[in-house]
């Protein structure tokens, strides 16, 4: 079973928003209590937070699917649902969040650094929040918005000041054990170290620094031999690279200079350019017979390359203290050379006033509407409720979607897709006005001839049975077989004029004449009626 994992694929799902409640207040002696449905709660977020006590991504290796809590639904009596609980995932310092395509999203460095990986969905509004002067008792509520779901790749890049690189069994783990209190596994066979080991070194009065022991490299590591270059990501943040060279190796064809050239070639093959990092050479195992002579022999050549050289023995601890002090001074100078981070500058880019909140594009035989608002509205609409559908149509019309569709040549009945929902577009009253302005609708019952070139919207009434059909159009035009919009919409009644008592009486008399068989030639009545009697329910206004 693995004990160290530095790369995982995380499947994060934020909580869904709670549904709004559709409720009417019921109380003794209050016949018109009004709507009192509460709002749904917000869905929980999925957050990543750096925890200094976490050193591996092992938890996400066994539990890659993480889901936050959902919001609770609203209830009657104006009771709002509780928000969903946020899910906080603890990650090691130095965790990099990548998209599945490899694009870096965020780099989490420093204890307490937090990033919201997936946002919870909005809670749906209850009918109490949807009430208006025209819609005093909505018979619907909004659905909760689904939370975000995404896949992310988490990679751990150790945050260390010094990286120890070299061949297997060169003594890197032993050096970490004598420099710090770390106790990595040490044995006399290659590839004992399979995962990076970190140790904190305190040398003299200098600030502590961190040393990382990277698993051994061999020729061809860039092509995947040995452990490959898989763990070299852990030295990307290091400010100093230390080559640990074995002066006591008995393998043929190996010596400190050859080992140095091989390791440098493998580092050059790594994707990240490490050529700007300062180098330091440690000649290890000088306590072994003939190893000290070899160290003295190669030291001038190494110094000629501009490299600082230290001869040590981790077994006898010869030269270890001097090496620790030298490393501490180098790290301190490198830290001082790093410019202090500038304060984060927040740039505000306000959206232009005339910039639309949506997009409309033609696709195939229909149109596709995009934009944050239309997509969110569709997700929060209960399509089993006709009044909710009418409310959605009104919102889209007020946003300008219907006018834009008319400009692009849309006609009634064309397929319009918003998100995962496809509609057969039937314009509302304002949408028909836009069609008239655009000159569209010829031959389909919605053109100028059908409307009589009127400036206001048309409302109709249909009488079933033997009474036949009748239609009333403001402005004197007669239109038949035009579909009504959904009941309860604002735009159906937007152009209705408030009538005087005499006008309402005249309309009532006209309806009576029609019931007596006198016919109905020119009227502004509005309503639905059925049966052979043609009982009209008109005069709404």
Swiss-Prot record:
**OCT domain spans which residues?**
350-427
The EC number(s) this enzyme carries: 3.6.5.-
Compositionally biased residues, Low complexity: 517-527
Q: Using the record's annotation, list all stretches that form the OBG-type G domain.
A: 160-332
Q: Where does Mg(2+) bind?
A: 173, 193
Ion transport recorded as keyword: no
The record's HAMAP family line, in alphabetical order, gives:
GTPase_Obg
Q: How does it assemble?
A: Monomer.
Q: How is this protein named in the record?
A: GTPase Obg
Organism this protein belongs to = Parafrankia sp. (strain EAN1pec)
């Amino acid at each position: 079973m693995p004990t160290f994992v530095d790369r995982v694929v995380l499947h994060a799902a934020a909580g869904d928003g709670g549904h709004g409640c559709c409720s009417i207040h019921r109380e003794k002696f209050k016949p018109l209590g009004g709507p009192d449905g509460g709002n749904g709660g917000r869905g929980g977020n999925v957050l990543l937070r750096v925890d200094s006590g976490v050193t591996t991504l092992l938890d996400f290796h066994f539990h890659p699917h993480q889901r936050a809590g959902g919001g609770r639904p609203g209830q009657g009596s104006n009771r709002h649902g509780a928000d969903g609980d946020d899910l906080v995932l603890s990650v090691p310092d130095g965790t990099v969040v990548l998209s599945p395509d490899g694009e870096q999203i965020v780099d989490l460095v420093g204890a307490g650094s937090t990033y919201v990986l997936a946002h919870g969905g909005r809670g749906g509004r209850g009918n109490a929040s949807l009430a208006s002067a025209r819609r005093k008792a909505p018979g619907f509520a909004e659905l909760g918005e689904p939370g975000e779901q995404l896949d992310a790749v988490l990679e751990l890049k150790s945050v260390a000041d010094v990286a120890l690189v070299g061949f297997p069994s060169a003594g890197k783990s032993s050096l970490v054990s004598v420099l710090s209190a770390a106790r990595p596994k040490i044995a006399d066979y290659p590839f004992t170290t399979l995962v990076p080991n970190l140790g904190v070194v305190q040398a003299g009065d200098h600030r502590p620094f961190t040393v990382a022991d990277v698993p051994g490299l061999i020729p061809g590591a860039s092509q995947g031999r040995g452990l490959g270059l898989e763990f070299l990501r852990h030295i990307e943040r290091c400010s100093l690279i230390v080559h640990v060279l074995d002066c006591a190796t008995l393998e043929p064809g190996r010596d400190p200079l050859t080992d140095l050239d091989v390791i440098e070639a493998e580092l050059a093959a790594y994707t990240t350019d490490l050529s700007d990092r300062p180098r330091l050479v440690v000649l290890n195992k000088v306590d072994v017979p003939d190893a000290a002579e070899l160290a003295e022999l190669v030291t001038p050549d190494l110094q000629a390359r501009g490299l600082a050289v230290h001869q040590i023995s981790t077994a006898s601890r010869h030269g270890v203290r001097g090496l620790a002090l030298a490393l501490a001074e180098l790290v301190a100078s490198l830290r001082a050379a790093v410019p202090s981070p500038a304060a984060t500058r927040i740039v505000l880019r306000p959206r232009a006033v005339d910039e639309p909140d949506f997009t409309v594009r033609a696709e195939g035989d229909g149109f596709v509407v995009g934009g944050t608002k239309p997509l969110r509205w569709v997700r929060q609409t209960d399509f089993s409720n006709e009044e909710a559908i009418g409310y959605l149509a009104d919102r889209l019309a007020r946003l300008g979607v219907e006018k834009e569709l008319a400009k692009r040549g849309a006609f009634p009945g064309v397929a319009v897709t918003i998100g995962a929902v496809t509609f057969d577009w039937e314009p509302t009253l304002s949408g028909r006005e836009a069609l008239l302005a655009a000159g569209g609708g010829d031959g389909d019952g919605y053109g100028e001839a059908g409307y009589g070139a009127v400036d206001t919207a048309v409302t109709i009434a249909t009488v079933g049975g033997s009474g036949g059909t009748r239609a009333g159009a403001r402005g004197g035009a007669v239109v038949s077989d035009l579909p009504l919009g959904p009941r309860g919409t604002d735009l159906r009644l937007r152009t209705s004029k408030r009538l005087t008592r005499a006008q309402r009486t005249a309309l009532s008399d006209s309806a009576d004449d029609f019931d007596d068989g006198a016919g109905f030639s020119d009227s502004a009545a509005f309503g639905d009626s059925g049966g052979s009697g043609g009982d009209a329910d008109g005069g709404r206004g």
